[in-house]
Amino acid sequence: MTRSSNDNDFSQTPQPNRSSNVWIWIAAGTGCGCLGLFVLTIIAAIALPTFLNQANKGRQAEAKQYVSSMLKAQQAYRIEKPTFTNSLPELDLGIQPETMNYIYKIVPQPDKSKSVMVTAQSKITGLKSYTGAVFAIKKGADVTTVTAICESNLSTSRPPAMPAPPKDEKSLVQCPSGSQKL
């Protein structure tokens, strides 16, 4: 391939038809930029609710974990003593009664030797609330425990009610209306 001597000569004035193409490229680039911005806006509108939902799932995981830990600690406490405890510090878990997302409570039941309820009450709109229960059930001469965690079906600051106690250790705990068992 041979080069002409004019290929590297930049001293020549541009041809008129070539300079008018610059405005076409600028206009096309601006249009593409607007189209790109429009597409990004649509993607953001789709992704933002998903992102916020993931953040809420993380916050709800805190409540599920804390309620589960409180139930396990109540089971251990009940093995050592003839009743459940009403005191969060007695469980020795290091769980604070209140976090940024939830308020945690141990709700005493009429017969502290048979059952206990723990709750995670949502403080933030969009989060579900939780109720956990431990039931002590006689099995011959021994006592065994059955646990359940109920999650509210909708986001609410009201934890589900206490589930009904199972008839025996093989029966499933039924969560109250408006909640589901985890």
Could you say what each language-model-derived stretch is?
Residues R18-Y66, L71-A76:
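Amphipathic alpha-helical segments typified by the pilin-like N-terminal helix
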Residues M1-I24:
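Low-complexity, intrinsically disordered extramembrane tails and loops of integral membrane proteins
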Residues Q12-P14, A47, A161-A164:
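Selective for proline/serine-rich intrinsically disordered segments
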Residues Q12-Q15, Q54, Q60, Q65, ...:
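Residue-identity detector for glutamine
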Residues I79-L182:
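Periplasmic/extracellular, small/polar-rich flexible segments of pilin-like filament-forming proteins
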